[in-house]
Amino acid sequence: MKADIHPNYVEIDATXSXGN
């Protein structure tokens, strides 16, 4: 989702989701 706008967010989003 946010990874589309912020590639760096993908790392934070994945952690919070707890998924890859």
UniProtKB/Swiss-Prot annotation:
Cofactor descriptive note: Binds 1 zinc ion per subunit.
Chain positions recorded as Zn(2+) binding sites: X16, X18
Provenance organism: Ectopseudomonas mendocina
GO cellular component labels: ribonucleoprotein complex; ribosome
GO MF terms, alphabetically ordered: metal ion binding; rRNA binding
Cofactor(s) it depends on: Zn(2+)
Subunit annotation: Part of the 50S ribosomal subunit.
Protein's name in the database: Large ribosomal subunit protein bL31
Keywords tagged on the record: Metal-binding, Ribonucleoprotein, Ribosomal protein, RNA-binding, rRNA-binding, Zinc
Membrane spanning stretches: none
Task of the protein: Binds the 23S rRNA.
Family according to the record: Belongs to the bacterial ribosomal protein bL31 family. Type A subfamily.
